[in-house]
Amino acid sequence: MFLRSGAMLAIFSYFLWGITPLFYRLLPGVQPLELLSQRVLWSIPLLLFVRFFLKNRTWVKAVWADKRSLLLCLLSTSVMAISWCTFTYSMTHDLVLEASMGYFITPLFSILLGVIFLHERLKPAEKTALIFVCAGVGYQLYQYGSLPKLALMMGSAFALYGFIRKFIRYDLTTSLLIESLWLLPVAIVLYFWLENSGAGTFSTADTVTRICFILTAPVTLLPLLFFTAAVRSTTLTTIGLAQYLEPTIQFLLAVFLFNEHFDAVKGVSFSLIWLGLLFCILSLIRHHWKNTAKAGLGIKPR
């Protein structure tokens, strides 16, 4: 029953993403490049197993026939590597609060990409949200003299990754496998370079730490698979509302469990961002109710 509920799958996938900081507490101070290398190396056998389990029979010839998607996978995996390295750095260096901010503002970056590249028109609620988010980031710049760089990098990179994936025609497991294969040479070079330079920790780590390195693959991929199943069986409104669960959990973990520094400046900054997002959430709910009412009257929703 759980697997048939799109809403529950969406909530579960974002819940898993939200609690990932707990996992990365087991790998404190590890270099993001080493985590990237290990994640790619272990993702490939995991994805091959998933494809076998799902009886995915996409052949090399079919993949090669769509060269546009093949090249887009190269672009998307490059962007995702930046996003993931930034994310893992924040997880392993007590910067979960900034990661939380990054994911709170990701939807606003997605809106901007739609406006710039797809010529979409901003709704009044989206305009208001952007103003409040800019005010929140600007307030930190004014008070601290610097921007929340990690948050901005994570938010923009993840939004760009999602934007690029819209144009990839492969199914999820095929595209994820191709993305991993594109990064495989980089992962192998990184592994040997880090080990030879003495900066790598995998070969000298204890058994528990090695297992944690291996688990970076399922910790990254399983929520994504649940999320994809959710998208196919629930409304975009539900997805749009559920996406704020992840940064909310990360925020609560950072402040109340990890005791990260949360002063008045960050309080004002986050409050402005939350206020802006509230306009987007209310707009989503209003749009959903409006379409539901139209459907009840036999009018085609827009």
Stretches found by the model and what they are:
Residues 89, 106-125, 248-267:
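C-terminal transmembrane-helix exit sites in multi-pass transporters
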Residues 40, 244, 248-302:
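C-terminal-most transmembrane helix of multi-pass membrane proteins
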Residues 1-12, 45-73, 124, 176, ...:
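Membrane-interface interhelical linkers
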Residues 27, 35, 90-91, 116-118, ...:
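Hydrophobic/aromatic residues within transmembrane alpha-helices
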Residues 1-34, 135-167, 253, 294-302:
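Glycine-/small-residue-enriched transmembrane alpha-helix faces in small-molecule transporters
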